[in-house]
């Protein structure tokens, strides 16, 4: 692993600025093992719970965006310092595979998919402004995927890029209709 003092310093500074105003830290869109390890190490000394979210390689729900194994990332992040594991800003299909890996760690886990056609065109420093939204994932599809993920044991559900408030509202209506209890996943 490459420990990056520059990256660690950035995460520590962010933690220092937020620690008095937050209940817990969410570390999102971790695309490599180094990135995740540096973030967890930097934030674990603030006496706050940590939810970490990994970004998956498009087309392979077992790999991070960097190409490294998701299971190896979970093994190396000091899992005892983590309160929950998620997959975010990734394709629905990849998340469905990756959740089976997260489940093995015995922590609350979840999914926050994006609704992009593809992020493969992205290069370092580019914005997602030019990425197109998928046309094949409607609100009811989001709800159906979420139901599958609930059956896998997910306790954290939400959305990332291009998952609009209408999608979240559709999910909320489904959860209420089916009498799912909202729980604080840190209890």
Predicted regions and their residues:
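Active-site-adjacent beta->alpha loops and helix N-cap segments on the catalytic face
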Residues: 30-47, 91-106, 163-171
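Catalytic-face loop-and-helix region of soluble metabolic enzyme cores
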Residues: 61-62, 69-156, 174, 178-180, ...
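An active-site-proximal structural segment forming one wall of the substrate-binding cleft
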Residues: 9-20, 24, 142, 149
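A cross-domain feature marking catalytic cores of carbohydrate-active enzymes
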Residues: 29, 52-56, 87-89, 113-115, ...
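Conserved beta-alpha-beta core of the PfkB/ribokinase-like small-molecule kinase fold
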Residues: 36, 43, 49-68, 120
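Single conserved hydrophobic/aromatic residue that forms the stacking wall/gate
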Residues: 1-7, 11
